[in-house]
Amino acid sequence: MRIVFMGTPDFAVNALQSLYDGGHEIVGVFTQPDKPQGRKMVLTPPPVKVCAEKLGLTVYQPKSVKTSEALDILKSLNPDLIAVVAYGKILPKEILELPKFGCVNAHAS
């Protein structure tokens, strides 16, 4: 099954790791853009990006998923399922309808 994973914080890392360890085909990982953090405002990648890169997965960091560019990327990945875990953005209808088996969302709140 071709899975696109969408997540950002530490909370989402275990889900990504579990999908990977389960042998699922993760065709792309979407996460929020790197952002300045701390007193020195050092540009810092989200935890999901760090994990995905360690696993050798392709990472996408669009500022918005509501652009034609982001939609085109998702279409090209041809996902069967999109797994969303604390991504931090509301997905538009076009994305929700894209995968063959739909989207699954988990959030800590």
Regions found by a protein language model. Name each.
Residues 1-109:
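One-carbon transfer enzymes
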